[in-house]
Amino acid sequence: MAALASVPDTLAPGSPAKVGILDLAFAVRGGRTELVERYQKTPLQIMRPLWIDPEQPGMSYVYIMATGAGVAQADRYRMDFRCGPDTQVHLTTQAATKIFRMEHDYASQRVHLSAEAGSYVEYLPDPLIPFKGSRFYQRTEVTVAPGATVVVADTLTAGRLARGERHAYRVLATDLHISRPDGTLLAIDTLRLVPGRRGGGVLGPAVFAGHDLVASLFAVTDRVPATVLADALHDALAGLGLLHGVSVLPRDCGAWVRVLDDSPIRIAGAQEAVRQAVRRLLTGRPAPDLRKP
């Protein structure tokens, strides 16, 4: 990605509206999770927190939004989420993230999420859609304290599928890094997708495997044994007819699942099935319908 860095003929990195920042902190106040610190810089912003879960009325639901139509060249986004002890937080996006065509430089997004003991945090953004010629890097760093639960997911598409556009982006690179506060590594998931370049294949069995969408979900928790969580994930997908794989994470810290398919609707259904399975297993309660189209 560094090789693509350049000064575009439009607004350069660091220009107004090119650096989006979200810095949010949550704490328990009056029996429910409240947003106690907030800093936001356009184009990133949030809706005010919602408390819409009748089963867990203290959980704060936060929708992340961007004032532009999508991510453009030379955009630099950074999001920091700090979830205090015993907080309950659900973080999601308003819609899919569109990565526009780029002629110069690249765009990046960095996410830092920390969860303290007793917290239950979900970070479940909508799919990432890379347009033809786009160049994008995303790094997600998650710090999970012992006694905390974090569920983090992502969905990558091959492009604008309705237009017949598949793997026409220039570069799509993502890193997920999950660790303990003392630095103990729990999981790493790295993707480097460079269509057309030798060694940068995108259709192999370890990537898209000939499909149009790939979705992943990692659940880190010590509320139940990792094998029990993995079995719940597998059972949630067993009857859906989608290609998927489930495995436990190291040190008995949780489990993860990856799903491949060609239908955005089926992928969304699979993500919802595993979200419900994790929520029911770990809390004994279902998750609410978020009413996204």
UniProtKB/Swiss-Prot annotation:
Subcellular location, principal: cytoplasm
Any one GO molecular-function label of the UniProt entry: nickel cation binding
InterPro entries linked to this entry: UreD (IPR002669)
Domain of life: Bacteria
Keywords: Chaperone, Cytoplasm, Nickel insertion
UniProt keyword annotation of Cytoplasm present: yes
Entry-linked PANTHER family: UREASE ACCESSORY PROTEIN D
HAMAP family, per database record: UreD
Quaternary data: UreD, UreF and UreG form a complex that acts as a GTP-hydrolysis-dependent molecular chaperone, activating the urease apoprotein by helping to assemble the nickel containing metallocenter of UreC. The UreE protein probably delivers the nickel.
Family statement drawn from the similarity comment of this UniProt entry: Belongs to the UreD family.
The name this protein goes by in its record: Urease accessory protein UreD 2
Organism: Streptomyces griseus subsp. griseus (strain JCM 4626 / CBS 651.72 / NBRC 13350 / KCC S-0626 / ISP 5235)
Gene name linked to the record: ureD2
